[in-house]
Regions:
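Sec-dependent signal peptide recognition
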Residues: 1-8
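N-terminal soluble domains immediately following signal/targeting peptides that reside
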Residues: 18-149
Length: 149
């Protein structure tokens, strides 16, 4: 009986860990005035204790032909699991926000392209791990191609 209980708890933990991911939205989606000037907001999903999530973000881009990586500040909103990303990169150039997160043993990642009018939801990519350098480069290339059309 004890083994069955331990196995059930392990399966629940595994199911939650495998489902850890991000969902992005406009600042209005946070329903918090603190996010009003944000570039976008995101929510963690599949984390049993969202307040204990560890989140980081970088702006990955090309500026005047030179590759840049800038650390961004991620602001936690009052509601656990909701975060805002504010503009922390130059207006010129091609930029993608690289989100990384952990919740217990689970990891999540996302690449959020930034266009002239803000984040591009339909071109965003989500991963069950941090994005690789190759995925970042591919997304930057796609963003450049999108801008030339």
């Amino acid at each position: 009986m004890l083994r069955l209980g331990i196995a059930a708890c392990a399966l629940v933990a595994l199911a939650l860990a495998e489902g850890f991911t991000f969902t992005i939205g406009s600042p209005v989606a946070s329903q918090d005035f603190q996010a009003k000037g944000a570039s976008f907001v995101f929510r963690t999903e599949g984390c049993a204790d969202p307040a204990k999530s560890q989140i980081s973000a970088t702006a990955e881009g090309l500026l005047k032909g030179e590759r840049k990586s800038l650390t961004l500040q991620v602001m936690a909103m009052p509601k656990p699991g909701i975060y805002a990303v504010f503009l922390g990169w130059p207006a010129e150039g091609d930029w993608i926000v690289n989100l990384k997160g952990t919740c217990a043993d689970a990891k999540a990642g996302a690449l959020v392209p930034i266009g002239p009018k803000g984040f591009i939801r339909e071109a965003s990519k989500f991963f069950p791990r941090p994005a690789t350098d190759a995925e970042i480069e591919t997304s930057l290339k796609a963003l450049r191609q999108r801008g030339k059309k």
